[in-house]
Amino acid sequence: MTHRACDNRRAMPLDDRFDDLVASLTGFYRAWVIQLGIELGLFARLREAGPAGLTRDGLAVAANAAAEPVSAWCDAAYAADLVADDGSHVSVDPDVATILLEKDRTEYLGGQFTYTVTASLDYDRMAEYLRTGVPVGLRSARYHRAIEELTRQDIAVFFEEALAAMPDLVADLVQGIDVIDLHCGGGRWLAAIARRFPKARLVGVEPELDSVARATQMVQRAGLGSQIRIEAREVDEDLSVGSFDLAYFQHALHEMPDPVVALHATWRMLRPRGRLIVLGWCLPDGLDGYASLHGQLVAGVALDELFHGARLRTVAQHAELFRAAGLPEPEAIPLPSDATLLVARRDA
């Protein structure tokens, strides 16, 4: 039996514990207020209005929404310290707008709120999963679209943090290499790479058909069809051998039906000196790691992943997968955002 260290968190008096739990309850409503503000463009319209803000009726008109519920949203957003209200006009703080709306920044959290709220729409089946241990299997198309919004932050992390940790990879991408993105979703990482490194040759593999359709449409709209090819398929042993210089999993390895098979198949695709890179958010190694905001978020995501048959892992558990697939021990690179890069490279 594996024993985990306990951090023995400080006991709270009853009144403090009550306040702590009430804060969790209000956090549920705050998440919904944020998601609605993002989806309906309320934060975007307030940001466009600048420091002067908008009247509540003006906000409803600008967002093409109904006045009474938008006014109620303003009350909830003000109560949650998301907007300011001087009695006549509502405005949004620039930093709040940046965090919730700017998708190309590592601080972007709008996708996290979209994912969390959207995932919770399936939780009418969560109690049954806990009783039986039988995952629900496939999630809805809306869930996969929310995952794409969630991973917008991952793309920013890759460009700002991962590439900074691997300057030799930047040089290779500039010169032009063959790259494959495994479980590419809607293809946003591929498009970002294509724009930044126009000599790179890119392939995206994705089994979920709704995501394949969105990725294909996005590539066509962006005029990147000569640089990016999307394939509707799973990651398996039938993938081309010795055809790529970089194989990339972005928040995706844990979703594979058999991660060991996926890693082995991916390794076979690489040419000499080729890299296999996994970017993800790993579970803490012990209980101490859960006593933080990051630990709380990862623990919640881990439960959601188990719900449909996926599994987040610690860095050590990832290393076990690599060994089981016959790969060398990956180098684990912790990033400032708390994400982790796992990197393995073929010999020359």
Q: What role is predicted for each listed range?
A:
Residues V260-P272:
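A short glycine-rich, Lys/Arg-flanked "PGG" loop and its adjoining helix->strand segment in the class I
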Residues L279-A325, P330-A332:
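C-terminal alpha-helical "lid/dimerization" subdomain adjacent to the S-adenosyl-L-methionine
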Residues D245-P259:
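A short SAM/SAH-binding and catalytic strip from SAM-dependent methyltransferases
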Residues L224, M256-P257, L270-R271:
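Helix-to-beta-strand junctions that scaffold the AdoMet/dcAdoMet cofactor pocket
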Residues D236-A247:
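A short acidic, Gly/Pro-enriched loop at the edge of an enzyme's catalytic core
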Residues I180, L190-V235:
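Class I SAM-dependent methyltransferase SAM/SAH-binding core
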Residues S24-F28, L36, A76-I177:
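Conserved Class I S-adenosyl-L-methionine-dependent methyltransferase catalytic core
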Residues A325-A348:
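Core SAM-dependent methyltransferase catalytic element
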